[in-house]
Amino acid sequence: MARRPAGPTSRDGGRRGRTSSAIGKIAPDAATSPKAPAPRPAPPPVPPDPNLVLLGEFGRAHGLTGEVRLKSYTGDPQAIAGYGALQTSDGRTLALADVRPAPGSSPDMLIARVKGVSGRSAAEALNRVALFVPRDRLAAPEDDDEVYAADLIGAAAVDEAGTLVGTIVAVPNYGGGDLLELRPPNGGATALLPFTKAFVPVLDVAQRRVTVAAPEDLFAAPGEKPADDPG
C-alpha cells in the first residue's frame, strides 16, 4: 500500500481513506498497463532527515501578490494546507495560509499563499523549496505492507539481480490503483509500473529501494519492440 499522509492505498487494492499525504499497500494484482511514458523535468527532493516526510514542493511565483505554485504529494492535494507549520528543505519553518487548484493543471498542482510571504520577489525565492512534516505527526503504517508514498519518491527500483532499473519520481493514482513512475538510469521519458505485489514483490523503505519485476521494454517508445522480438 502507498499511503499519502492522510489515508492509505495498498498492494491489496483500494484506499482505506484519504486526507493528506497517504500510505498505501501494494495490490495483489492489477490489470493496469505497466507502461505509460510521461516526461518530467526533475525528480522530487529527498528528505534531509529520515524522520521527515515530503508533503510538497514550491514552483514558480504566480501573479504579483505573493502566491506561488505548489506541487502537493498528499492524498487529497489541498489537505496539505491543514498540516500547520512545515519544515523546509532550506531549514525554515513555513505555514500555508490557503491553497486552491491551479487552473489548467493536474489535481496535485496548487496555487498557494504562504503566511508572511507577500510580493512576487518573495514568492520567487520559494521556487524548488520542499515542504516536510515530522513523521511523528503522521499515523503509523498499519502493517509491514504499508508505506508512505513520499518514502518511495526518490527510491531506487532494482530487478531481482540488484541491477538498477530506474528511480521512483512519483506515485500517481488515476483511479485504478497506485502506480510507480520510474525514470530510467540515464534519464529520458518516464514509465509507469503498477504498485502491486506482482510488479513490486519487495519493499525496503529503510534502504530506499524496491525490487520490481518490470517488462524488458518498460522504457521503450510506443510501438518499439525489443531486439529479440520475433514479430
From Swiss-Prot:
It is found in: Cytoplasm. GO terms for biological process: ribosomal small subunit biogenesis; rRNA processing. The keyword rRNA processing applies. One of its GO terms (cellular component) is ribosome. One of its GO terms (molecular function) is ribosome binding. The PRC barrel domain binds ribosomal protein uS19. This is Ribosome maturation factor RimM. It comes from Methylobacterium radiotolerans (strain ATCC 27329 / DSM 1819 / JCM 2831 / NBRC 15690 / NCIMB 10815 / 0-1). The gene is rimM.
